[in-house]
Amino acid sequence: MVIPSLPLSRWLSPLRRYFRHELLPLLADLRLAIGLFLAIALLSAVGTVIEQEETVAFYQAHYPEHPALFGFLTWRLILKLGLDHVYRTSWFLALLILFGSSLAACSLTRQWPMLKVARRWSYLTRPHSFQRLPFWTYLPQRSLQGLPQRLRQRGYAVFQDGSRLYARKGLIGRFGPILVHVSLLLILLGAIWGSLAGFKAQALIPSGSVAAIEQVTGAGDLAHLPTWQIRVNRFWIDYAPDGRVKQFYSDLSILDGGQEVKRQTISVNHPLSYRGVTLYQADWSIDSIRIRLNNSPPFQIPVVPVPTQAGSKLWGAFVPTRPDLSEGLTLLLPDLQGTALLYDTQGQWIGSLRQGMSLALDEVAPQRFPNRLTLHLDEVIGATGLQIKSDPGIPLVYLGFGLLMLGVAMSYFSYSQVWALETEAGLYLGGKTNRALVSFEREFARLVEQQLLSSPPSPAKEPPPAARVGGTESLANG
C-alpha cells in the first residue's frame, strides 16, 4: 500500500491558520502582557532583595532553617528554586521570551496595521464627508487659493489634485509606539543573551603576579572564558590623614599570548575593559611579606587574615627564628602603610617595624633573643581584589534604552490631518488629530480665519450648511 504524499503547503496551511487565528491573538492579549510584566517585576524584586551569586555557606548563615525568614524562606528553598541566581534560571528566561513574544505579537497585530492605515490617505470628494470630522467648516464664496502655502508654513505635507486637498503632519508620531516596542524587544534580547553568554568571576592577585580568569562565580550555558591573562604591575592604597582608606589602585596589564596588549591603572568606579570583559577594583588584601634575618637572602612569608571582634582588617604572619620552629615572631599588619607589630610566642609585644627598616631583636628583647638577631622588613606585598564581568548583552540593552527614549519622544508628536474641497459655491475645510485637541482646535480656527481674510469671495450658488469649527455648531458666513 502506497501512502500518497501531500504537498508541503497542505501541511503548513493548518499551522498558519492556528498561528494567525489562535496563537497570535492570544500572545497579543493585553492582559497576558500585563501579567507577564508584573511577574517579571516581582521576580526582579526578589533578585534584588536576595543576594545573588553567593556561596552556599553564605545562604546557610543568612537564611537558616531555624528560625526561617518570614517562616518559610530558608537556604534550602533559595537554592532549590534558583533564587540565588534568579536572572539566569530557565523559568525567568522563559518569562522574558514569552513577554518578548507578546510584545512582538502586539506590534504585528495592532501597531503595524495602525501605521499602515496612517500612511494611507485619500481625498474627500463629497461635502457630506466633512460632517463626519471632529472639526469642519464651510466657507462660502472662498477657494483653495493660499491654503497650501499656509499649511506648508505650519509643517504640513500637502497633496493637491485640482479642487481637492489633503495635508498631514506628525506622521513620525505613528512610528513612536512601534519604536518603543522594538526597543523593549532589544532590551529583553540583551538581557537574555547576557544571561546565556555572560559570566562573573573574582580574582585576588598579588602585586607583581600574573593570573588567569579561573574563579568563576556565575556563568551562562553559552559563556566562554577568555584565554588572556592579567598581570598586576603594582597595587597601592591612598590613605586619609586619619588612616581611612581614600582609594586603592591597581596598575594592570592584559597579556594575550604573552604580549602586553593593554595597560591601565584602575580604581573604584574606574574599571578596565578589554574585548567585552570588564575588570572592576573591588577589594584588597595583604598577600605576604618579604623579610631578611641578619644577613640572610630575602625570603617571602605568606600572611593570613586574623579575625577581630570589631570586624576590622588584620593580617598575621609567623617568622621562625629557629630551624625547629620552636621560637619565632608573630607579625601583625593592620594595613598596607608598611607598619608591622611584633609579638613573641608568649604574646608579649616586642616592638614595631616599618617597611624598609630593621629591628635588632637582641637589643629590644635580650631575654627572648640573647643571640644577635636583626629583622629586616623589606616589603609588604599587597593583593588586589578584582571583580570580573562579561555581559555581551549590554550593547543591545544600551541600544534599546536609547531607542526607547527616542520612541517615547516621537510618540508625543500629534498626527494631524486636514482636508479641503473647493466647489462652485465655496470651500469645505475639515481636520482631525489624535492628541492635543485644544492646540489643533486653535490652529484650525486660525487657519479658517486666515482663509476668510485672504481668499477673494466669489458669487455663492448654494446656501451654506451648518458647520462645526472647534467642536461647536455655527453657520459659516463669509
Curated annotation (Swiss-Prot):
Domain of life from the UniProt record: Bacteria
Main location: membrane
Residues covered by region (Disordered): 453-478
Subcellular location: Cellular thylakoid membrane
Record carries keyword Nucleotide-binding: no
GO cellular component: plasma membrane-derived thylakoid membrane
Disulfide bridge positions per record: none
Biased composition (Pro residues): 456-466
Assembly with partners or alone: May interact with CcsA.
Protein known as: Cytochrome c biogenesis protein CcsB
Gene field: ccsB
